Amino acid sequence: MRPRDGFVGTVGDTPLIKLRRASEETGCTILGKAEFLNPGGSVKDRAALYIIKDAEERGRLRPGGVIVEGTAGNTGIGLALVGNARGYRTVIVMPETQSQEKKDMLRLCGVDLRLVPAVPYANPMHYARYSGVLAEEIAASEPNGAIWANQFDNLANRRGHYETTGPEIWEQTDGKVDGFTCSVGTGGTLSGVGIALKERNPKVQIYLSDCMGSGIYNWYAHHEWKPEGNSITEGIGNNHETANLAGFASVDAPLQARENVGVVAARGRMLSSVRPGCGTMTARAASSPATTLPAP
């Protein structure tokens, strides 16, 4: 393996790993993109790097400046690590209900962490909305400026996956990929990878994996925002259309995974949480006409 160019050079280029149990049960080859091998431990490192690079290229982020974002955790970790490497400070707004491990990790990365109540998006104190207001307040007094990363509506998020994740999957499979699925929060991974793969082969099937408590499944299936049930999964699901999802019409089928099924899938040693567990269960169901995975 060749040496990487500094810390940010370690982001991306993650391997594909065959998920043996899921492959055996379906008779298909199901591969997982090992995004946990990114330095921040998640796929969100890619979005963080591209959001920061985009702000630098536009002249909106200067040395010593501040990055502000509202996040359930992983994007904040990525922004903090990349920001540290490039000389920026990071302020993160997070719902107080998120896991203690994420809070501890963010503080370990030197983040100025602001916790807010977990409220619906319509509430001005919703973590994503409040972070935008906070960014404006900090920018007014910060001599080196401050940016709002705005991962939900910043198309640099999608571009990061269009330029890296999608092409990596294509190259690592020698173009022999039949379908792709992932869970959705901002929509950057699904849309970026989906566009990249469809450009290379329009027959590649794109499946949207949504958790209970989110309205994205019903939006794509029935064109209405109608969440069902409750969610315990952190960082995925949504009840409004983000800019990264807007206009993305390449979803061949939306699928809905119940979280108790995701918990079962997450017991595999490579899967670290319910979130990738839901994605694995969706991959198992992709060849089935059913759109809701039954409880075990």
Predicted regions span which residues?
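PLP-dependent amino-acid enzyme catalytic core
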Residues: 1-296
